Amino acid sequence: DSKNASFCFGQTMVICRLVVGKYPKYRDVIPQNNSNVLKINRSLLLNTVRRVSVCANKASNHIKFDLQSGSLEISAQDLGFSIAAYEKMQCQYDGEPLTIGFKSPFIIEILSNMNCGEIVMKFLDSKRAALILPAEEEEESGKICGIIMPIMIS
């Protein structure tokens, strides 16, 4: 019928309901002209975020990235339990010094689903979405990209 689509794969059948309307212009939400660029090993960043996020507040999962030329410091704290974690690592960073916050599960999710050695994170400022790409596909027209909204940090 005209309201559903079906797909058969061997003995499996998937039936989907068709949505009426115009598909959103998803390319319009991909940040463009980001002047601050971080290049780092994906697994190093992923493992560091996992370690540091253990000390993040369980309700908010906030972590903070402090970016300077040649270094990235990731930190998290839970004032209720008086715990904190800080890890500093070397990286390639081209841009102004920047402090930006993220929810750690979202960073972990994006990095876990990329199959590459190095990633590039592009930022405009601490209030706008960041773009995460495999370093091999640095062009925004690549096959995969992650977009993550920052959080307000104090």
Stretches with model-predicted labels:
Residues 1-19, 34-154:
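DNA polymerase processivity clamps
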Residues 22:
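Glycine-rich, pocket-lining loop/helix-strand segments that form or immediately flank
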Residues 29-33:
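Short hinge/gating elements
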